[in-house]
């Protein structure tokens, strides 16, 4: 049986003001959460392309390249902490599910109120019973650009992250810094989800650029044909090389002494970052593209 969670950071009630005020870890968590909400506000109407009304493949690719920075930095941030498995495995009578699930549900509920999920590329991991936003978006042009299809692969992203990526990214151990660990997890998960769900916009742009080429495969529900149409191997190779290079640049250990490149160490392994894109990010993005296209001609 795994060890029980230490609730020394959450005495009395997990979110009581008295417990939070005495916990350095919790104060850090609140500061990061507040910053996250500020970022949410700035991204509410941000689509995957620079031009929300008429995104192009070039504008979308520019956005995806910028999102690489967020994901690489997110991987570096999460790699700072050990696996902290009690965060994901143990439950308590104080809340349903694991501590991480509780953290994500409460965070998503608050982020829903400030409008995070008004953007078509933003999808919650726990969509049930989310509160409505406190305001209406100024513009929904990107939603009008897309075909009205409900598509969400967040659960698949969640499972891959916890079961496959996290064991490769974090060293084994438990430092009991569950608040900051959960915060870095959620920021990385949301960055991955946003990038992957941009596949809907990518698919729509590709369809509009050459509808006749896609319609035949869509009418025949031919997944293999659609996979060939949405796959650009040369582009994918560039992406893998670029994110690995970013991991080397962003994750370099900076010292005042001269360091031999052969012995240089990084905060996150560059080949792992490349693998994240090769094994999970790009395949899931193409899955979103194909699922979207298969229903593109539906009334």
Region spans (language model):
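N-terminal chloroplast transit peptides
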Residues: 1-33
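Extended amphipathic alpha-helical regions
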Residues: 41-299
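Cleavable N-terminal signal peptides of Sec/SRP-targeted secreted and luminal proteins
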Residues: 31-42
């Amino acid at each position: 049986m795994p060890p029980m969670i230490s609730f020394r950071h959450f005495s009395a009630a997990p979110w009581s003001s008295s417990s939070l005020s005495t916990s350095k870890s919790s104060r850090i968590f609140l500061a990061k959460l507040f910053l996250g909400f500020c970022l949410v506000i700035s991204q509410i109407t941000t689509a995957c392309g620079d031009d929300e009304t008429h995104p192009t493949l070039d504008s979308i690719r520019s956005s995806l390249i910028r999102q690489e920075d967020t994901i690489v930095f997110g991987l570096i941030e999460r790699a700072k902490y050990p696996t902290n498995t009690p965060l994901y495995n143990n439950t308590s009578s104080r809340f349903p599910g694991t501590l991480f699930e509780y953290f994500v549900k409460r965070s998503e509920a608050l982020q829903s109120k400030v409008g995070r999920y008004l953007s078509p590329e933003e999808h919650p991991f726990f969509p049930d019973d989310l509160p409505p936003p406190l305001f209406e978006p100024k513009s929904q042009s990107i939603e009008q650009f897309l075909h009205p299809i409900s598509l969400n692969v967040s659960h698949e992203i969640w499972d891959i992250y916890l079961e496959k990526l996290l064991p490769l990214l974090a060293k084994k151990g438990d430092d009991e810094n569950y608040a900051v660990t959960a915060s870095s997890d959620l920021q990385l998960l949301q960055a991955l989800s946003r990038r992957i769900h941009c596949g809907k916009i990518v698919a729509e742009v590709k369809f509009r650029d050459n509808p006749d080429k896609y319609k035949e495969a869509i009418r025949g529900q031919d997944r293999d044909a659609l996979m060939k149409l949405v796959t650009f191997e040369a582009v994918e190779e560039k992406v893998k090389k670029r994110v690995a290079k970013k991991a080397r640049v962003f994750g370099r250990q900076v010292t005042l002494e001269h360091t031999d490149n052969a012995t240089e160490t990084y905060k996150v392994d560059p080949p792992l970052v490349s693998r994240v894109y090769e094994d999970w990010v790009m395949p899931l993005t193409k899955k979103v593209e194909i699922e979207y296209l298969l229903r593109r001609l539906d009334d």
